[in-house]
């Protein structure tokens, strides 16, 4: 074989590729066509195609076993056409054994490369082709899990996603595969987070952590601690979240497996995103922006499209909370382009909603309101609820700008009821603050009504350790009282809140607070 290959290279019938870690040889198109004709004439084409499919099935199976828990494998984009050809041939021949085993082995490759639409196609075909011998086995477990991931990211949070994850988890529990139990419980956590049901999501995060403890794998324990931290942030338990996330991210590897990408989900990236948001809420705006930027850099380095998309989305979220709309817009544009390129349909509406928020900030109230309505409709259709509270709050602010006060109050009240029901509490102080400001602007509303709601916002922010939202509520209270000449107490309260910050003094909120304090000699 070596001599034959060398002879073909010498005759320029084969090209050599030295760009990767392994030297690769490729027949020229004319040579390939000639060889295929000879193969067909010999009657051995079917035999060679079967060997080709089996060889890639075995290669992928071996690499998946070697990379188990490491989030990496050697086979990559340069071999994807071979894998596709093998799958096409296997299913065309109705060779159920080869087709389903190859699809199961290829699933991690499709997920690693974020070829989600393709992954969905092959997993659906393979599950339909499973016979009774493979139902309830490791093979079906892998196929169902990968089907759920590809469905969730391309089609939204349908019941079929929950069914696929649930079936895979049932098999993992039946065969005693703790690693897969951790990963599937983590994916069910993400599924419920995306639905906006944060209380049910938290239950699954705790279950994932319990399964990781049973594994005794330090990396999985750290990863699921990060998952719990992310959930605590969304539940408004920011101090606990900050501790969990900080501890989880201290783990850098060593004994056990890396807390990297499994079944298309990047534990570490998700924890860093959540840490950035939690840092902002707890009053560490400068650190939040730095961590968000680092998360985007890390995600770009992994070359994992779904992970980069999430990093861009949440880095933009941090910048939006910090009112740094210029830099946020740059991330949003990159996020939308990335989501389109990789068919991540449920994310596109989030990007459009964030662009609408920037339009509101720039004074384009009607355009912003119209786009937010479309974004919210699309998000609800895809059952992607993680940004509904924030967008509904912005919609209410836009309606207030247009003088549509009754609809603004109805919008914010409806969203607060939903958020309370499902535990979407991290933005509740901001929703209360915006409602208070709407009431303060609303003709015929007594000042004490607005003040009572703003006080609720302040007290809830305090209970959540959300210092940044506490500052906003204190500023709104001071402004409201200044309208009727009784702002002194609330200005002193604002000074007290301002004095607890140790960084972020250049942010718009902090500059506004400083100007208010300077105006009364308390700066």
Regions found by a protein language model. Name each.
Residues 63, 71-133, 141-151, 182-184, ...:
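Short, well-ordered secondary-structure microsegments
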Residues 60-64, 111, 152, 193, ...:
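Specific register positions within alpha-helical solenoid repeats of the TPR/Sel1-like families, i.e.
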Residues 63-64, 107-110, 134, 148-155, ...:
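Short coil/turn linking the two alpha-helices of tandem helical-hairpin repeats
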Residues 160, 410, 414-417, 421-523:
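C-terminal non-catalytic interaction modules
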Residues 152-169, 173-426:
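Extended non-membrane alpha-helical scaffolds
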Residues 25, 29, 53, 76-80, ...:
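Start-of-helix signal in alpha-solenoid helical-repeat scaffolds, especially tetratricopeptide repeats
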